[in-house]
Amino acid sequence: MKGYCDMRGFLTFLVLRLISKKNISGEEISKEIEKRKGSKPSPGTIYPVLKYLKENGLIHEIQDTGKLKRYTITKKGERELKIATKKFISIFCDMKEEFN
């Protein structure tokens, strides 16, 4: 993975950022996004992102009680998140400049 360029947009960035804060389930990720955005993403939106992050070694799946799966960020995920954060900040600052 080559930093931000391979991250599939803002949703992937946001999911990875949420996972970096705490071990979290897919349902909890959806609820956190709903709090921020006002609408809850469907499982068909969240779980492909989790699969992508897992297949690229950015997160690990942890079996919690029962069938609940939680996700935790890997060292590689932390590095990629740092790169992506800088890139998104740069993009959004540039956009803000254009609109002012």
Predicted feature residues:
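Short, Lys/Arg-enriched, disordered terminal segments
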Residues: 1-5, 97-100
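N-terminal helix-turn-helix DNA-binding core of bacterial DNA-binding proteins
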Residues: 2-45
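Sparse recognition of residues in long alpha-helices and their boundaries
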Residues: 38, 45-46, 93, 100
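Short, hydrophobic-biased segments on the C-terminal half of alpha helices
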Residues: 47-52
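Glycine-centered, phosphate/nucleic-acid-interacting loop/turn motifs that mediate DNA/RNA or nucleotide
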Residues: 57
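Short beta-strand "wing" residues that participate in macromolecule-binding interfaces
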Residues: 61
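Basic, amphipathic "hinge/linker" alpha-helix immediately C-terminal to the N-terminal HTH DNA-binding motif
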Residues: 65-85
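Amphipathic alpha-helical dimerization/coiled-coil segments
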Residues: 79-100
